[in-house]
UniProtKB/Swiss-Prot annotation:
One of its GO terms (molecular function) is lysophosphatidic acid binding. It comes from Bos taurus (Bovine). It is found in: Lysosome; Melanosome. The lineage of its organism: Eukaryota, Metazoa, Chordata, Craniata, Vertebrata. The keyword Metal-binding applies. Residues 20-195 form a propeptide. This is Tripeptidyl-peptidase 1. Lysosomal serine protease with tripeptidyl-peptidase I activity. May act as a non-specific lysosomal peptidase which generates tripeptides from the breakdown products produced by lysosomal proteinases. Requires substrates with an unsubstituted N-terminus. Its cofactor is Ca(2+). SMART domains: Pro-kuma_activ. Glycans are attached at residues 210, 222, 286, 313, 443. InterPro entries: Peptidase_S8/S53_dom, Peptidase_S8/S53_dom_sf, S53_propep, Sedolisin_dom, Tripeptidyl-peptidase_I. Residues 199-563 form the Peptidase S53 domain.
């Protein structure tokens, strides 16, 4: 029997009906609000699918993250290289051989992997993909404010049982591109403006968080920072230049990004893309900045998953990454969540600081078997990222103390147990808060978030050459906090110290030193008689609305400069 007939025999064995399993039985497959089907995809249309191959030594990877991130460890700051991580997690030869043979037999082509070899992306026709992934049925969909197009299957898929030890999930089937949660308020009318401000700008941020004109990058190090875009929108260099002309006059800054990873289209700029770039580069002023851009992606690809693949394929990356993406934990399969968590763990082992927005739905709300519960967000709930909540000025027109922004996401994971680094802080909150919701609404033993916060209300943004006021959301607070951490990395690098890396173990050991404690306000939740729209409330120390608080830059710099 020739090699081709052998492959066909292998493929026939793999697709035999009863010997199959579902890798993601709990994946939500409902069409998101605002999306509509345009009909079945043509059988000969090409799809790009990503196969997540089973990794090795994940427990050892977790131990190494703890060792390199804990200031009390002799390995603190001795981060792994991408090649070190690849040696650790690379799938077994049996896994690589089995999956490659299966895909080759199915007619997959133009397959490419990443340095860590734990993802394999291949092109197949719709006909081949539906045969390969039993049960899948691909349709064209359109939705979201930008009329984004996607090819997805809302049907469960199954894989040959022989692949169960080798494949975690297949990307490009169920998960739809995210949409923006940014809000824009009408501009308030204020009689007289002496001593007042009419919205958050870089100068307001620098005043509130005690930055001086000297708190900028030196331009002499290899320090860099990045933001990632997963929405179907763009930023424009001309908007960034205009933003800095209007608002960057009192500090040294860069007026263009150093590198765009991905494709920048020529369409209209998006407010969220503009916001991320403008405030990362004004908070982390004069520091080289990358933008990971998803526009131009194929309709069958998942933008967030593609970003994770990029991290697994670049040896030299920016030290700080800010990300404004999130999904409800319950909308994602447990297999997908656990695998993405491992990808975030890989980044932490390499000394990358990943900051994720906590979300803009407060504690969230959903109904389970007729009972309301809070609804945590992922990756905000991952124990391997630093999650950023949101605040408002007590007086929205003055640089005052901060209070909770009621939309600030926060709560307790239903997937991840509470990590040891936050045990003391969370236990103290749960035992001392006078305003806890009923225990049936949240998992008190889960990973609690956010970890920190910053202003998230009333920002000025320049988009499509137009200054736009009163833009709000944790998509604003996240790049601000990230930029300040980049400034601290600058000082550490100049002193010969390693970059901050995964911040949480150190952050919780310091008990909020270097941060303004936000003690007033509660965020929103379920609109029912039991909780009446109130989720968790802030209080002294850590809380699940604003974390440890907002940055006091000189004090935070001092706190984080110790080796």
């Amino acid at each position: 029997m020739g090699p081709r007939s052998g492959l066909l025999g292998l493929f026939a064995l793999f697709v035999a009906g009863k010997c199959s399993y579902s890798p993601e039985p709990d994946q939500q497959r409902r069409l998101p609000p605002g999306w509509v089907s345009l009909g079945r995809a043509d059988p000969e249309e090409e799809l790009s699918l990503t196969f997540a191959l089973r990794q090795q030594n994940v427990k050892r990877l977790s131990e190494l993250v703890q060792a390199v991130s804990d200031p009390g460890s002799p390995r603190y700051g001795k981060y792994l290289t991408l090649e070190d991580v690849a040696e650790l997690v690379r799938p077994s030869p049996l896994t690589l051989h089995t999956v490659q043979k299966w895909l080759l037999a199915a007619g997959a082509r133009n397959c490419h992997s990443v340095t860590t070899q734990d993802f394999l992306t291949c092109w197949l026709s719709v006909r081949q993909a539906e045969l390969l992934l039993s049960g899948a049925e691909f349709h064209h969909y359109v939705g979201g404010p930008a009329e984004t197009h996607a090819v997805r299957s809302l049907h469960p898929y199954r894989l040959p049982k022989a692949l169960a030890p080798h494949v975690d999930f297949v990307g490009g089937l169920h998960r739809f591109p995210p949409t923006s949660t940014l809000r824009q308020h009408p501009e308030p009318q204020v009689p007289g403006t002496v001593g007042l401000h009419l919205g958050v700008t870089p100068s307001v941020i620098r005043k509130r968080y005690n930055l001086t004109a000297q708190d900028v990058g030196s331009g002499t190090t290899n320090n860099s920072q990045a933001c990632a875009q997963f929405l179907e929108q763009y930023f424009h260099d001309s908007d960034l230049a205009e933003f800095m002309r209007l608002f960057g006059g009192d500090f040294a800054h860069q007026a263009s990004v150093a590198r765009v990873v991905g494709q920048q289209g020529r369409g209209r700029a998006g407010i969220e893309a503009s916001l991320d770039v403008e405030y990362l580069m004004s908070a982390g002023a004069n520091i080289s900045t990358w933008v990971y851009s998803s526009p131009g992606r194929h309709e069958s690809q998942e933008p967030f998953l593609q970003w994770l693949l990029l991290l697994s394929n670049e040896s030299a990356l920016p030290y700080v990454h800010t990300v404004s993406y999130g999904d409800d934990e319950d909308s994602l399969s447990s297999t997908y969540i656990q695998r993405v968590n491992t990808e975030l763990m890989k980044a932490a082992a390499r000394g990358l600081t990943l900051l994720f927005a906590s979300g803009d739905s407060g504690a969230g709300c959903w109904s389970v078997s007729g009972r309301h519960q809070f609804r945590p967000s992922f990756p905000a709930s991952s124990p391997y990222v630093t999650t950023v909540g949101g605040t408002s000025f007590q007086n929205p027109f003055r640089v005052t103390d901060e209070v909770v922004d009621y939309i600030s996401g926060g709560g307790f994971s239903n997937v991840f147990p509470r990590p040891s680094y936050q045990e003391e802080a969370v236990t103290r909150y749960l035992s001392s808060s006078p305003h806890l919701p009923p225990s049936s609404y949240f998992n008190a033993s889960g990973r609690a978030y956010p970890d920190v916060a910053a202003l998230s209300d009333g920002y000025w943004v320049v988009s499509n050459h137009v200054p736009i006021p009163w833009v709000s959301g944790t998509s604003a607070s996240t790049p601000v906090f990230g930029g300040l951490l980049s400034l601290i990395n600058e000082h550490r690098i100049l002193r010969g110290l390693p970059p901050l890396g995964f911040l949480n173990p150190r952050l919780y050991q310091k008990h909020g030193a270097g941060l303004f404690d936000v003690t007033r306000g509660c965020h929103e939740s379920c609109l029912n008689e039991e909780v009446e729209g109130q989720g968790f409330c802030s209080g002294p120390g850590w809380d699940p609305v604003t974390g440890w608080g907002t940055p006091n830059f000189p004090a935070l710099l001092k706190t984080l400069m110790n080796p």
